[in-house]
């Protein structure tokens, strides 16, 4: 998640990031760059390779290997929230399960991942 561009301020409670988890990151990068003309940029993360997708000056997503080995490839949307801890607590009260508690992602802020009561995954990103 990039916060390097002044014109990329996140809108609270809007989807602000899209992340692809796949064991074949090279194949996915090749597919999406050829299909849509997206550009890529490496983003340093401890212990993981992370590649961000860009279109023009806008960075909007990334690709990495799944956090859980053996997980099927999938896209995950992140919603920007001004109070990550408070939003997680509210989500739990509404029946969500926290899959990844608040985690710092370098200079790009903090994230968390939850499963909604219907079973769908959603990411949260501090804004």
Where are these regions (language model features)?
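Residue-level detection of beta-strand scaffold positions
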Residues: 17, 35, 50, 76, ...
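Conserved short beta-strand elements that form part of the metal-binding/catalytic scaffold
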Residues: 4, 38-74, 117, 121-126
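Short secondary-structure junctions
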Residues: 37-43, 97-102
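Catalytic core of tubulin tyrosine ligase-like
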Residues: 32
